[in-house]
Design a protein with these regions (language model features):
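N-terminal Rossmann-like NAD(P)+-binding subdomain of aldehyde/semialdehyde dehydrogenases
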Residues: 1-123
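Short acidic-hydrophobic, aromatic-tinged amphipathic segments that line or gate anion-handling sites
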Residues: 2-9, 182-187, 307-312
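Conserved small-residue-rich beta-alpha loop and adjacent elements
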Residues: 107-173
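Alpha-helix C-terminal capping segments
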Residues: 142-153, 176-178, 196-202, 220-222, ...
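Conserved NAD(P)+-binding/catalytic subdomain of aldehyde/semialdehyde dehydrogenases
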Residues: 179-257, 261-266
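A glycine- and small/hydrophobic-rich beta-loop-beta segment
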Residues: 257, 261, 269-341, 345
Length: 429
């Protein structure tokens, strides 16, 4: 873990970005490779999906949609205990996200002028669920339940197949609990292309959400405009603000819970107490050796772990706001008092019993969060990502007559005479 002492004047945003090195590096070579995959699927459809799945996943698929038989086979492999946990998690996620639902509205703003907004679910969305180092049934729930709460009538999910040509049973069990019925065994950039462009057997979607590897991130970036996307997700990150009142064993465990995701996952400890920070560092080294994903955690901690030694709480949260972390834990006495100091964080966990994994699985708020500093301008996935709104405007004759001349003056000032003409012809009524 690299130690950084924050000077009295603090660091600038540019300095913090340099120190933390959280840029999502999507190279030109990667762009070329992904562009070729997208073009192949767009032009080749189902045949291209089969060819690319064989090439990248080593699996030959005649039909890449999950069948009811495969779903039932998967459910038979899942323990009843895990199925109940999935159901409880789904209920918590659903309850939380129902609070985000917006209702359409109209209001009489002036005599004869009715204005409003109409909120409508996106009619068809695609959800990408990653495979790779681990299977994430939690991501299935987090990314599909808000879409269903929003009222999206069509949700298509895709995820990479295993070497046996099947989807991980836990992934399918989560989809079953969520209520998703359209599931495909297609991963990587080709999965994104399938959702964006459609094939002979797959209807295209209007928006794609969900995290993935660099190929998936690049594919989402390149199809944006053809479809909407939620975000470009980078490696996971956690930031913990803590002092000597916290337990270094607990803090170390929380930091490692994110380090195990990816060799490029970042962990940040921000503290005014150097002795406490050193205890956390020692604990991280000890605990890593006892956990199964040691090599991944070791790479993350060696390359992307930073400890910022600050002068006081105000300086701690100044650094937090410049990092704009995906996950932020605050383990200081009376942690709620610091909320007004926090501007930039994807998810905020207050107090020593609010360990970050609660948010990953069971609490209810979404765990698909902005990474790489993007929490400074973006938000967690939610119902609002699956809804669009249209403005609604209605004038009666009297209201039109009051405003018509002013619109004509405005239009002519911009040189748009046809706009003015559209008003003039109604003046004669």
């Amino acid at each position: 873990m690299e130690w950084i002492t924050v000077p009295e004047k603090g660091f600038t945003l540019r300095e913090v970005r340099t120190l933390t090195n959280r840029n999502v590096n999507l190279s030109e070579d990667l762009e070329k490779s992904v562009s070729a995959i997208l073009e192949k699927v767009r032009d080749g459809g189902d045949a291209a999906i089969r060819e690319l799945t064989k090439k990248f996943d080593g699996v030959e698929l005649s039909d890449f949609r999950v069948t009811e038989e495969e779903m039932q086979e998967a459910l038979a492999q899942v323990t009843p205990e895990f199925l109940e946990v999935l159901k409880e998690a789904k209920a918590n996620i659903e309850t939380f996200h129902k609070e985000q639902v917006r209702k359409s509205w109209t209001k009489n703003f002036r005599d004869g002028v009715e204005l409003g907004e109409q909120f409508l679910p996106i009619q068809r969305v695609g959800v990408y669920v990653p495979g790779g180092r681990a299977a994430y049934p939690s991501t299935v729930l987090m990314d599909t339940v808000p879409a269903l709460v929003a009222g999206c009538p069509s949700v298509a999910m895709t995820t990479p197949p295993g070497k046996d040509g099947k989807v991980n049973p836990n992934i399918l069990a989560a989809a079953y609990v969520a209520g998703v019925k359209e599931i495909y065994k297609v991963g990587g950039a080709q999965g994104i292309a399938m959702l964006a462009y459609g094939t002979e057997s797959v209807e295209p979607v209007f928006k794609i959400v969900g995290p993935g590897n660099a190929f998936v991130a690049m594919a989402k970036r390149l199809v944006f405009g053809t479809v909407g996307i939620d975000m470009i997700a980078g490696p996971s990150e956690v930031c913990c603000v803590a002092d000597g009142s916290a337990d270094p064993i607990w803090i170390a465990a929380d930091l490692l819970s994110q380090a195990e995701h990816d060799p490029r996952a970042a962990v940040f400890l921000i503290t005014p107490d150097a002795d406490f920070g050193k205890k956390v560092e020692v604990e991280m080294e000890r605990q890593m050796k006892e956990l199964s994903r040691y090599e991944i955690m070791k790479s993350s901690v060696d390359d992307y772990a930073k400890a910022f030694l600050c002068r006081d709480a105000a300086q701690c949260f100044d650094i937090v706001n410049k990092i704009a972390p995906e996950h932020l834990e605050v383990e200081l006495p009376d942690p709620k008092q610091y909320l007004p100091l926090i501007y930039n964080a994807g998810a905020i966990f207050l107090g020593k019993y609010t360990s970050e994994p609660l948010g990953d699985y069971m609490a209810g708020p979404n765990h698909t969060l902005p990474t790489s500093g993007t929490a400074a301008f973006s938000s967690p996935l939610g119902v609002y990502d699956f809804v669009k709104h249209s403005s609604v405007e209605m004038y009666n004759k009297e209201a039109f007559q009051k405003i018509s001349k002013k619109v004509q003056i405005f239009a002519k000032a911009e040189g748009l005479t046809a706009h003015a003409h559209a008003m003039e012809v109604r003046d004669e009524d």
